[in-house]
C-alpha cells in the first residue's frame, strides 16, 4: 500500500480509494493523510467500519461513507438522514465529508431481489427528503441513480452526470480485458483484450462505439435525455425512470 500511493503521487496522481475498513491502522491512516485526496469507507455496519472512520477522521483525512441503497437498506438510510436533520443522534458519524449513495445492482454478489423499483415508496420518500433538506455533510450519488434524480426540483442538473462507462471511464479485469464498466465483468459483452490491443485502440474500437451508441440513441423524445441518456445499458432493470422509452 505505501508503495502504490507514493508511486501515484510521484506520477502526479492524487489517489483516492474505498475500503471496508478491515485492517485499518493508525499508520495507514497517516499515509492516507499524506498521500490521498479522500478515502471512502463502505458502510458495513461493523465495529471495524466505525473504527476505520474514526481513525481516518482523527488523522485529518477527508472521509466519505459509501452506502449501498437496496430494498432492505433504504429505510435505514432514510432514518439516519432524518436523525442528522433533527439531531436525535442516530445518524452517520460526525465530521465526515460526505455520504455517497450507491444504487444496488444485480451483478457479482448482488441479487435481483434487492433491486429497487422506480415505484418503491420508501425510495421515493428517501430522494424527496434529500431534495428538501440540508445535511451536516455533502450528499452524493453514483451515476446509476441519475434517472431518478433529474426529476427533483431542488437538485441542480449541472451537478449531475449520467453513466460514465465508455465515455470517460473504463474497467480493466485481472486478465487484461478492457470493459466500459465493471458491471460487464460477468458477460463481457463489450470486452476488448488488452493482450492484443492498446488501451487507446480498445477505447476507440467498434466494441466501445457500440456501447456508446446506447447513450446517443436512447429516449430521443425525452426533454431530459441529455441529463440521463437512457441510463444503464448493461443492467436496464436498475434504471429508475417511469418515462423510459
PLM features: residue spans?
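Generic structural signal for secondary-structure transition and capping sites
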Residues: 37, 61, 135, 168, ...
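A C-terminal junction/extension of Radical SAM enzymes
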Residues: 91, 95-187, 227
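A structural signal for well-ordered alpha-helical scaffolds and beta->alpha junctions
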Residues: 1, 49, 74, 119-127, ...
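Generic domain-boundary/flexible-linker signal
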Residues: 26-28, 50, 74-76, 110, ...
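A short acidic, often aromatic-flanked loop/helix-cap motif at beta-alpha or helix-coil junctions
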Residues: 47-48, 72-74, 106-109, 144-150, ...
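Flexible mid-to-C-terminal extensions adjoining Fe-S/redox cofactors in radical SAM and related proteins
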Residues: 177-178, 182-245
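Radical SAM/AdoMet-radical enzyme domain recognition
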Residues: 1-104
Amino acid at each position: 500500500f505505501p508503495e502504490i500511493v507514493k508511486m501515484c503521487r510521484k506520477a502526479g496522481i492524487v489517489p483516492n480509494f474505498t475500503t471496508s475498513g478491515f485492517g485499518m491502522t493508525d499508520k495507514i491512516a497517516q499515509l492516507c493523510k499524506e498521500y490521498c485526496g479522500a478515502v471512502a469507507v463502505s458502510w458495513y455496519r461493523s465495529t471495524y467500519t466505525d473504527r476505520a472512520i474514526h481513525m481516518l477522521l482523527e488523522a485529518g483525512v477527508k472521509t466519505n461513507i459509501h452506502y449501498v441503497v437496496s430494498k432492505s437498506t433504504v429505510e435505514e438510510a432514510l432514518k439516519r438522514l432524518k436523525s442528522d436533520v433533527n439531531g436525535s443522534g442516530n445518524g452517520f458519524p460526525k465530521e465526515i465529508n460526505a455520504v455517497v449513495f450507491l444504487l444496488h445492482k444485480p451483478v457479482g454478489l448482488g441479487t435481483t431481489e434487492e433491486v429497487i423499483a422506480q415505484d418503491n415508496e420508501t425510495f421515493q420518500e428517501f430522494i424527496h427528503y434529500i431534495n428538501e433538506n440540508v445535511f451536516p455533510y455533502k450528499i452524493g450519488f453514483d451515476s446509476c441513480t441519475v434517472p431518478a434524480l433529474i426529476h427533483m426540483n431542488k437538485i441542480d442538473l449541472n451537478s449531475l452526470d449520467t453513466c460514465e462507462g465508455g465515455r470517460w471511464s473504463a474497467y480493466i479485469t485481472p486478465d487484461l480485458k478492457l470493459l466500459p464498466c465493471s458491471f460487464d465483468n460477468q458477460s463481457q459483452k463489450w470486452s476488448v483484450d488488452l493482450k492484443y490491443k492498446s488501451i487507446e485502440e480498445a477505447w476507440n474500437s467498434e466494441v466501445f462505439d457500440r456501447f456508446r451508441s446506447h447513450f446517443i440513441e436512447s429516449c430521443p423524445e425525452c426533454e431530459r435525455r441529455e441529463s440521463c441518456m437512457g441510463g444503464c445499458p448493461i443492467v436496464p432493470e436498475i434504471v429508475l425512470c417511469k418515462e423510459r422509452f
